[in-house]
Amino acid sequence: PINYILLSLGVIIGYFFGVLMAPKLSLSPDSITTQGVVVFLMVFAVLLLDFIIRKNNVTKNNNFVILLFVLFVLLVPQVYNAPKLILANIFVLLATRRILSLTTEKNTIKKIFDATMYITLASFCYGWTILFFVVLYPAIINKTKFNITYVFIPIVGFLGITSIAVAYQFVVTDSY
């Protein structure tokens, strides 16, 4: 418990370094709310990473991975000025959680679709995260009893989520 408090404190300290390095600082209520959400999302990302590690026995009984994550965030505190990047990070962590859970044979199609959905949503926030589809296919081949329909689920999921996003853009902004 104390290590989570210290790591959360590290995230908050990194936030203050990121805000101090920002070229312009506004103290409007909207800006303060946005920055509070950013700090909450970063703490949530740390706790989500810890959950993924503990649930899938990635490391034994230590917190070095989340310590390294917090230290990397402290190395680049400008990440706090990019809320879309933090949101994409959370979506990638959620996709990683679903990919690692493919070892159990329950609801394999749902897990593959969920991972596809999270990667697609992350790519809407930050375009380069679409490359995580490269990780999804070897996981499908190696971690499941291979079925050819599993290969087409990410394609159908990506096209479905993208078509919903495009339809939303047409309705809301009247343009693509």
Which sequence ranges carry the predicted segments?
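Membrane-interface alpha helices of multi-pass inner-membrane proteins
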Residues: 111-125
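Membrane-lumen/periplasm interface segments of specific transmembrane helices
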Residues: 153-176
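Transmembrane-helix motifs of polytopic, lipid-linked glycan transferases
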Residues: 40-56
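Perimembrane helix-loop-helix junctions
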Residues: 132-156
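Membrane-interface transmembrane helices that cradle and orient dolichyl/undecaprenyl
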Residues: 95-110
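Transmembrane-helix signature of polytopic, membrane-embedded enzymes
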Residues: 53-72
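Aromatic- and kink-enriched transmembrane "portal" helix at the membrane-lumen/periplasm boundary
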Residues: 31, 68-86
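N-terminal membrane topogenic signal
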Residues: 1-11, 59
